[in-house]
Amino acid sequence: MMKHRIAAALALVAAPLLAQKCVNPHCDAQRLDFRDLGYPGATEIPADSSPITALMAHSNGRVYGATTGKSSHLFVWDSRVNKVFPLGRIADEKGVHHALVEGPGGVVFIGTGLSEIETLRLTRDMPEGRRAIETQLWKDIKAKYSSYAGGHVYAYDPKKGDGSVYLEGAAAQVADLGVPVPGNSVYALTISPDRKTLYGISYPDAELFSCDIAAKSFRRLGKWMEKLAYPGPERTWRGVPRALACTPDGNVWSSGDDGLLRAYVPSLGTFAETRMRIPGEYWETQAYNGFPVVEQLFAKDDGTLIGTTSDGFVFTAQPNADRLQSWGKPRVERRVRAATLGKDGRLYTICGERDNVCRLFSFRSDEGHLDWGVLGVDRSPYYAKIAYQFDAMATAADGTILIGESDRRAKLFMFIPGGEVMPGVLNPTNPR
């Protein structure tokens, strides 16, 4: 009798488990996994402060990341133990957006700001008139920063800070270098080839700045773009490039007004314009000032640029030849949310908008775009998760692709290249 009762109980428990199906990627599932951001109940970064918005591979073999939310936190992933270790709360900051850079001596520089992933509150009632919506939208965007002193640049030394244990609420061991652009967030950072100068762009005013690392001093270099455009898909966002890249000659590149690539030339102290226009939608038939911006941008050793756009395209550019080539887009939806250059010659990307599930893709010129699918991990009965939103990627020393989830209670995902997309692309075990 007891045996029958046990069997019946097991059947009741097993039935819903068998009915639930996790969505797996379009490759062998053991190539995808995730880790918590610390030890639950002890060091784990709080759920409302966990969305990952910056990742950076370090020369020490580890990968550093930062979060955005009620408070901003620093963390490190160590491949030797395959774990994430929180490194403390970054002062009183709310966010870090694409602004982690390794400098001289392995010091990590961190650009901070307000949360740039939260939904902005818009004015419901507004006066009528020419371009009234655009005018009010800019007022609403600026209102968020009206009482904000400005994002800081901090320095963190892994040699001094990595060995400590940071319980929940502990402060990160960072040194404050100051505020580069008052009333603005630091929106992106890069570093010069000689590793002596940081360059950054601010949001929402799109002002370029530099930081002399040795002198710990900032210079405001001027507006990167003058035009106010709201290309979307987020309709509460001013189109400001989310990445900068330094080529070997020291020039700083990104997209500017009207989607044209431009550079800051430090040797001359001036901006250089080009005719290289990034791919995307330009709304030529409408009385609307809209153009795409760079999402991610990487400079190769030969000076070639490879980047992505807010409309979801991948492109390469040869600045010395004033030549840009579009490689299309892997997904109908707009935005490349994150990207990183893999050790296998591929550009790995996360594509998708905020109201849908992001997917992992890769691009290489000899094979085009490959669809690796949704980032779903099923290790049931131990743990499982289908993640929707991502905003940061990095490539570890061994080639592992680290992907930062940017939802509440976020996890750090890891994808191990080397496998193949399944025949027919779609994983046949997924529900359809």
Listing of model-derived features with the role each one plays in the protein:
Residues 62-65, 108-109, 197-200, 251-254, ...:
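Conserved beta-propeller blade signature
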Residues 41-72:
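Beta-strand-rich domains and repeat architectures in extracellular enzymes and scaffolds
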Residues 113-148, 352:
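Short, conserved, GDST-rich strand-edge loop motifs in beta-rich repeat architectures
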Residues 50-54, 94-101, 184-189, 231-233, ...:
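Repeated scaffold domains used in trafficking and secretory/extracellular systems
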